[in-house]
């Protein structure tokens, strides 16, 4: 679990390039540097980022153009990181669409962990697109998609192992959570384990 094991993820937002290098040794280079490696980026048709095997080692090339927001660059890097961590064979065209969905989910969970978001929601925070953009440093489209995705998750049937993992993640990021959502007396009296009630509230997120 990268969220728990990474020394470079102690709060949000964080440096995605440092996490990638820490966990894989992969370096990230902008598209301008691609020529140095003999890589023709235009041949891959990706405007944002691409992971390539160069002489036995992987490199993630990304578009560092000024017209692309840093938040979008960060998500694109997380997306390519996801492809690597899940051992996706990107030459397998029949499963490519599935791989894209999985890589998007990987990046979203890394940059905006559902466990942290759910804890913030329990503390009375209104989880809006703007809220995620502000505190997690993500793009408008990534924040919007994250809310839409989490609304579809049914948390009423979490296993004991999943709940334990949730608690570990919330515990690690307690300082960040307390900073943006201090515990109030009303929260202390709230039944945080009433998952059915929480699920009903999530259904009304916007």
For the regions a language model picked out, list residue spans one by one.
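Active-site hotspot residues in diverse enzymes, especially metal/ion-binding acidic/histidine motifs
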Residues: 1-206
């Amino acid at each position: 679990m990268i969220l728990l094991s990474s020394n470079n993820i102690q709060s949000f937002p964080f440096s995605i390039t440092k996490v990638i290098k820490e966990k894989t040794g992969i370096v990230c280079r902008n598209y301008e540097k691609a020529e140095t490696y003999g890589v023709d980026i235009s041949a891959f048709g990706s405007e944002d980022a691409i992971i390539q095997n160069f002489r036995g080692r992987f490199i993630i090339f990304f578009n560092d153009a000024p017209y692309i927001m840093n938040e979008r660059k960060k998500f694109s890097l997380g997306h390519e990181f996801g492809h690597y961590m899940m051992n996706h064979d990107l030459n397998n065209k029949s499963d490519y669409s599935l791989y894209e969905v999985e890589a998007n989910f990987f990046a979203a969970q890394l940059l905006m962990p559902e466990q942290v978001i759910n804890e913030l929601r329990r503390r009375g925070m209104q989880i809006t697109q703007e809220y995620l953009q502000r505190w997690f440093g993500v793009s408008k489209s990534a924040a919007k998609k994250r809310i839409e995705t989490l609304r579809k998750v049914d948390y009423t049937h979490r296993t004991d192992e999943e709940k334990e993992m949730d608690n570990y993640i919330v515990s690690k990021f307690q300082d960040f959570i307390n900073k943006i959502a201090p515990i109030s007396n009303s929260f202390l009296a709230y039944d945080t384990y009433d998952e059915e009630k929480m699920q009903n509230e999530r259904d009304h997120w916007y």
